Amino acid sequence: MYALYVFGDIIATILGTIPFLIIYLGSLVTGSLYTLYYHKKEPYYSAVGASGAVSGIIYSSILLFPDMQLLLFFAIPIPGYVFGVGYLLYSIYGMKKQLGNIGHAAHLGGAIGGFVLTLALKPELFFINKMMVLLLAVPIVLVLLFSDKLKSL
């Protein structure tokens, strides 16, 4: 919830309360839908939580401020866009390896929702920083293209 507090404040301040709620709830839905899709052949799979929504908020904040400095392991400063791409790549790896009791598919689906909804609410981002938008889109596009193959790798 700390991540929601920190990153949510960025979105609420820049875009406003209603856009924040749209991104949060939309990411919650996309995270849930992607999880259902990814685990469609696992009838006993269950998950609970709002991690997809929080992931959408994080990815939205990074899209708004890709050069923000984040601390990796509370000590190593890295740019937001590096964290964003790394976060999604780790989620893909976690989905493949089924790491821990974590909803990696929800994280990925929520990030996709946060990315798409932020661009829908603030389309000028694409024109202001086209290369960064494309860089942040790469892991999303890869997942959407190869999602069915992810489990069989």
Describe the predicted segments one by one.
Residues 1-153:
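A detector for small-residue-rich transmembrane helices and their helix-helix packing motifs
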